[in-house]
Design a protein with these regions (language model features):
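Secondary-structure capping and boundary motifs in well-ordered enzyme cores
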Residues: 5, 17, 121-125
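Generic, low-specificity signal for short hydrophobic/alpha-helical stretches with a mild N-terminal bias
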Residues: 6, 10, 37, 111-113
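Beta-strand elements within well-structured catalytic alpha/beta cores of enzymes
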Residues: 7-24, 55, 129-133, 139-141
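Catalytic-core region of right-hand nucleic acid polymerases
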Residues: 16-56
Length: 141
């Protein structure tokens, strides 16, 4: 997790390809310091259900299922498979002794993007901000 003396924003763009990142990264650099711009490969499945839950829980998917079975839905089960991400992150922060002021926003629908823009100060005020943007949907903002 990030250093406690720096404000940090994690921008997680779901369904985002590396070539898309390369095309917009220069625009973001005017507003944010990009600490690292590397390409990584991992054994973690990249399907949204697995990847995003693992990122926020700090656990592999099988461990999430074993530790919190009431918060994990398998592929064959109906329901939202990423509905506990903020809860997973709170748990991870507590386990690591991080008592940061944080904000967590998911942008799936256009009105969620507009609401975030209207309340952007909460992102600036937080020690750690997470913005999850689902690129698979129509443009949010």
């Amino acid at each position: 997790m990030c250093s406690s003396d720096l404000k940090t924003t994690l921008l997680l763009i779901d369904n985002f390809r590396y070539d898309q990142w390369r095309s917009i990264s220069s625009l973001l650099r005017g507003y944010y310091d990009v600490a690292q711009d590397d390409f990584y490969c991992a054994i973690l499945p990249t399907a949204t259900q697995y990847a995003r839950n693992a990122i926020f829980a700090g656990l592999m998917p099988l461990a999430i299922d074993k530790l919190m079975p009431n918060k994990w839905l398998n592929d064959n089960e109906e329901g939202g498979k990423n509905q506990y991400e903020e809860e997973f992150l709170k748990r991870l922060m507590a386990q690591n002794g991080k008592n940061w002021k944080f904000s967590f926003d998911k942008l799936v629908r256009p009105e969620q993007g507009r609401k975030l823009v209207d309340n952007i100060q909460k992102v600036y005020d937080a020690d750690f901000s997470v913005i999850v943007y689902n690129l698979d949907r129509k443009s949010v903002v």
